[in-house]
Amino acid sequence: MPAELSPIDTAKFAAARRAVDLVQDGMKLGLGTGSTAAWMVRCLAERVREEGLRVQGVPTSTRTAELARALGIQVVTLDEAKWLDLTIDGADEFDADFNLIKGGGAALLQEKIVATASDRMVVIADAAKEVAHLGAFPLPVEVIPFGWQSTKMLIEETLEGMDVLGREVTLRLSGDAPLLTDEKNYILDLHLKRIGEPRPLALALNQIAGVVENGLFIDICDTVVVGHGDGRVSLRDLQSGQAEEGSIDMDRARNIFADLGD
């Protein structure tokens, strides 16, 4: 274990730890995917272990499921849970209206299904993920492998009529082969640079034959928790306008690392 966490890991831990404070005994939770969400799973496991917190977790990817089980969190399927109290997940970008780009970890389909089956979605992120306009991060689109090149052409044609600055579309690879999602689909990354109007773009993409889902999360996120490299953390709620500022005890992060043997 490093003597000190990097500023980026400090920020991710701070956001994750504050978000896990929102979890109550008996909740059914959506467990996100990605490096920040992995911190959340670790923090949740700490509460389960130390407080006897009883929760059920619905993971949004195979790797999140494996981590949650390894740390002692009860894992169930969404069909078993049926509906969730809260989902906590990361984001690749978010704007002032809490519109998101997600899918950098190729789990966007399960992430969106789980988030929309929840009473509340809380996004955890470091401060660098907040942007004035979405689009600097490539927008992932999950597509069926059959005819994916035709689907790509249809996406490129659709982008011609959209308020975006870039229109390059690339197939995401794993080594020399197409990356496969948990559902055995492909990911096309849309390099748009700036998205002027996310909502019509999201609707248009999902009308294209061969598109399974896109990484724009519109009207899904309720709360954003932002961590900073010095341990400060802010919580912002969209509907209530609530804004809280605080800080996190970083010794707890080091304890989590030590307990996990990292």
UniProtKB/Swiss-Prot annotation:
EC number: 5.3.1.6
Example of a GO cellular component annotation carried by this entry: cytosol
Keyword Secreted applies: no
Signal sequence bounds: none
Enzyme class: isomerase
Stored Pfam families: Rib_5-P_isom_A
Entry keyword set: Isomerase
GO biological process: D-ribose metabolic process; pentose-phosphate shunt, non-oxidative branch
Matching Gene3D superfamilies: 3.30.70.260, 3.40.50.1360
Superkingdom, natural source: Bacteria
Reaction(s) this enzyme catalyzes, per UniProt: aldehydo-D-ribose 5-phosphate = D-ribulose 5-phosphate
GO molecular function: ribose-5-phosphate isomerase activity
UniProt pathway annotation: Carbohydrate degradation; pentose phosphate pathway; D-ribose 5-phosphate from D-ribulose 5-phosphate (non-oxidative stage): step 1/1
Binding-site residues for substrate, renumbered to this chain: 33-36, 89-92, 102-105, 129
InterPro entries named among the record's database cross-references: NagB/RpiA_transferase-like (IPR037171), Ribose5P_isomerase_typA_subgr (IPR020672), Ribose5P_isomerase_type_A (IPR004788)
Active site, per annotation: 111 (proton acceptor)
Keyword Isomerase in record: yes
Protein family according to the UniProt entry: Belongs to the ribose 5-phosphate isomerase family.
Quaternary context: Homodimer.
Function: Catalyzes the reversible conversion of ribose-5-phosphate to ribulose 5-phosphate.
Protein name: Ribose-5-phosphate isomerase A
